[in-house]
Amino acid sequence: MRVLISGITSFLGISTGKALLKKGHEVYGILRPESRNKERLKGEKGMQLLSLNMESFLLWEKENEIEAEYTNSTTEAGINTERCITTERGITTENNSTTDSHAIDKSISLPSLARLHFDAVLHFAWDGVGSLGRSDIATQEKNLRMSKAFFSWAKAHGVKRFFFAGSQAEMGKGSREEPLPASPYGEKKLAFSEYGLRNHGKMEFIDLRIYSIYGKGDHERSLVKTLVRNTLRGMETELGSGNKIWNFMAEEDFGQALAFLTDLEIQTRGAFTIDICSGESRLLSDYIKEIEQIGFSFLKKKGLRYSGESLLRFGLRPPNVEGDYDFTAHTKELSALGFEERVSFSSGIEELYEFIYETEF
């Protein structure tokens, strides 16, 4: 199967791409022409990276709307979609072909992209995912418009299955069934989710509600990595209350889950929402305490000194923009389809301690 991934250099994009390659799929990833993150994929054999600005799909959508109303409109506007569109608009022609078996990076035009005839698209690209960005209305509105244009492009070019990387933010104060998003980020992600479920036509639309994924590739200031580093250093960690239901899933299991869903035969449902999570949800504070205890055991095993007294300081940090709400995951959906997790929370955290200790200490 030929698969296109937007946001390929993200933590989740990389995890998914690796899992799909292992299953024998052809994997193409979209990244910004100026991306500084493509080094994350260095050495990934078989992955093909395509330099393309996601805003290009907005231009494609605009051109197609014009063509529907006026004859020869692209000629009148001075736009030639078969040749190079200026790099200011975010597209360059194909070049830099290579026979390197590692990740291939080349620029591509939209017509050339269409000729690759993708079977599935996994859409991770979404700006403003940090706390400040989630509150930025303009950024989140732009994300929504670009996502709709990308969706329309995929639908128009025969893509069979479109995956959207949603999150808990769409639920906010509510639930998956009755969402009440608490931020512009959650509102716009929910808006695209609903748009895809309504307008997918013959293209299958899988609305992924992704819970907290942890692992080696997670961003450096994530809660889990911060806890691991602080435990190794014997430093205190200031935290929120931790009194909310949470769910953690290992990055290896996440990638495998997406590869599983990509291969899944869908008999009766052309579009549906599914939670991507582990089989267990519990209080966030319980997870946090377990991470610290695993760290103490790790330090003892290494023969390193530690006090044994908890360095967790709950109740000192305010909630983020999403608020301090329970996120109750549908923990049985993936297993009901036949997916099996391989990494327990304890073993995943032990591996992360080993990785961070070996690479940073």
Label each PLM-derived region with a short phrase:
Residues 131-138, 173-177, 219:
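Conserved catalytic-core motifs of eukaryotic protein kinase domains, centered on the activation segment
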Residues 184, 194-246, 251-255, 259-260, ...:
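NAD(P)-dependent short-chain dehydrogenase/reductase
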Residues 30-35:
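N-terminal Rossmann-fold cofactor-binding loop
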Residues 3-23:
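N-terminal Rossmann NAD(P)H-binding glycine-rich loop of SDR-like oxidoreductase domains
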Residues 138-146, 183, 187-188, 249:
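Glycine-rich NAD(P)-binding loop of the Rossmann-fold in SDR/ketoreductase-type enzymes
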Residues 54-73, 100-142:
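NAD(P)H-binding glycine-rich loop region in Rossmannoid oxidoreductase-like domains
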Residues 235, 239-243, 247-361:
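C-terminal substrate-binding subdomain of Rossmann-fold SDR/epimerase-dehydratase oxidoreductases
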Residues 121-123, 127, 148-184, 206:
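Conserved Rossmann-fold NAD(P)-dependent oxidoreductase catalytic core, especially the SDR/UDP-sugar
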